């Protein structure tokens, strides 16, 4: 324990001796503590201006004076959190070093004197004091009295004290005199080889009477301190007036270390007697500062520390000025006021689709421009919809047509933590609007400031219930800052003061989260929901994007592109058109055509770039197994055959052996269509529509069943690894057929259980209805399943098919109905009967036309892909038709 205490004391003592290289009083308080230990070197090196050796807890680094201020400003001055010091952190002496750091921190605390130095005059005085103290401690005034160039002598002196020199290859260098003079013809010519105007030659002749005495000493060494810039010059000892020899960087006595510092190899291993005989070591008595020009002295010595300190304080003052400016203008908001879009004029002709909306907005823009016709028009529009559907583009076109300023702000600009800042920004915004009206204000992402105030309403309801029990107490509700901003917006939009010649357009992606107060007429008179474009709109949008190209596009290709780009919004279509033009240009250049041509292959490659794909198999030939090629060919051929014959199914444009994943937006629309979410869709479509949909979805699985008739275990659940809506989609459609009563069944009359009639389940009338439903469903289900009961018990693939692909026991039965659990299971059996019937019909139809199915599958295997024209030619050659009448016909 005593030994540890002594080691800590010695460590603190060493730091104390070297800590005041820069006076602690002059270190600004904003700098953190610098716990550094200057490397124990000769005093000569310690007084050098150009180099400071800093040792931060056993870490030796070579830095300049500017680096000292850098190291003092970091948050971790000791480097304890640095990755390169992780090994040191695991040292056994870690606790001792932590204690030493705490002790040093208590001893060397930054002085608070700098806190009063807030004005520039005080900073100049302190800077001057620092410069004077620094150069006085380093003996600069002794070398340059009265700013005259007086040169210190180049002195050789013996080192008698062993503590004056510690041999360390990282900061010192000793070189044998005989090695330095090997290139000379004679050692005696050293004095004569020096230039006549060299101060070194004059000093050597004046201080050392007999030069031959030094030359004849075989083991004499010269100690050269590093850090003077000598090691970085091309001819090291020819730097300035030190013309001892021409030892260059490529010499054998010079080596490079990791941090790219050039040092001289002392070669101490070859001369072990040097460390013992200190009398044979010569070193410089003082720094040989040899400058002859006063401007050079000022620039190189005096202005260096002055610039460092001035920069540090100036940086602090500039930072304060920036903070003041930010505090002064914190309530201001940047508004881009554009009278007309001349550079990039956007008109309604540049927007495809939405003809009725464009006509209405064009009328409002005309009324803004010509006030003589009418002063009554919608004062606000709320644009809602997914991103990329043209909300901002429509607002820009409206402002250009009206020739009015277009003000664009973001809703997030009015969400601030500081109290009152957001309200000040709202006031500043509408004050600027009064000066430039009539104008159009476009608020993007308005849901960030117009969220529904549900929390405050809940608190009010709770306080109303307990308000009577609290007498004489003030009840306050803390509102969020966004609520106060919303209230201020509501007042400016339609409050006590009238809003003149200002149309506010708000855009949001989440209209369901908006507050009811901001959506009422008078604030937002019209609420318009933007959706992905339909077929005709996509065709119009692609026409606009491709109108300025020289590529040839026929009408059939345009129709095909509009049909196959389902699910893409306006931004996606613009990107699709750009990729089509790029690929067509590359193809025409490769084929040396003057005019590019846009065909189906170009569209397919462009669509692959636009589509967001989750799963891609790079090499299908390596990934596919033995039966995968045949399974894929028959699966795609069955889908192509059924979809070609049934009018309600989506047409197949091409069949490929290696199916590519669909884009995400296409799949989202497919999921929504297959779910049949509302009765509106059912009212426009009869039972035949849904029956054809189910048959088309089960066609691929039925074709695989024909191929693997004797190997039912090889049948796949789905092939498209991204998402296959076939199996789950067929179950969803059958579920809604039964749920909405499209069949001759009583089950569609009873819908989901409501919370109001939950207590009426035990009512006698409800019990009679449940019994009636149970008997009806049981009779119908048994009648439909009678012809499949034997096959279901024999074939193994039926068990594989139903248990894995139709999890009705996990999803359907969880929903609450007012009938009993037994009747709900019968409803599930009715869904099963629909799927059994339609799957069996699809299987029988493809089995009866197995020759046509084999023909299509062979073409897919041979050509890897077939087009829609080839499919129609093959199907029409066989003259096959499929009945598309009613459910009873199936």
Curated annotation (Swiss-Prot):
SUPFAM superfamilies, per database record: FtsH protease domain-like, P-loop containing nucleoside triphosphate hydrolases
Cytoplasm keyword on record: no
PROSITE patterns: AAA (PS00674)
Domain of life: Eukaryota
Predominant place of localization: plastid
GO terms (BP aspect): protein catabolic process; proteolysis
The keyword Chloroplast belongs to this UniProt entry's keyword annotation: yes
Pfam family membership, one: Peptidase_M41
Record InterPro entries: AAA+_ATPase (IPR003593), ATPase_AAA_core (IPR003959), ATPase_AAA_CS (IPR003960), P-loop_NTPase (IPR027417), Peptidase_M41 (IPR000642), Peptidase_M41-like (IPR037219)
Binding site for ATP: 385-392
Keyword terms, alphabetized: ATP-binding, Chloroplast, Nucleotide-binding, Plastid
Family annotation (SMART domains): AAA (SM00382)
Location in the cell: Plastid, Chloroplast stroma
MF GO annotations: ATP binding; ATP hydrolysis activity; ATP-dependent peptidase activity; metalloendopeptidase activity
A GO CC term attached to the entry: chloroplast stroma
Recorded family membership: Belongs to the Ycf2 family.
Miscellaneous note of the record: The protein in this organism is about half the size it is in other chloroplasts.
Protein task: Probable ATPase of unknown function. Its presence in a non-photosynthetic plant (Epifagus virginiana) and experiments in tobacco indicate that it has an essential function which is probably not related to photosynthesis.
Protein name, as recorded: Protein Ycf2
Species of provenance: Mesostigma viride
Designated gene of the protein: ycf2
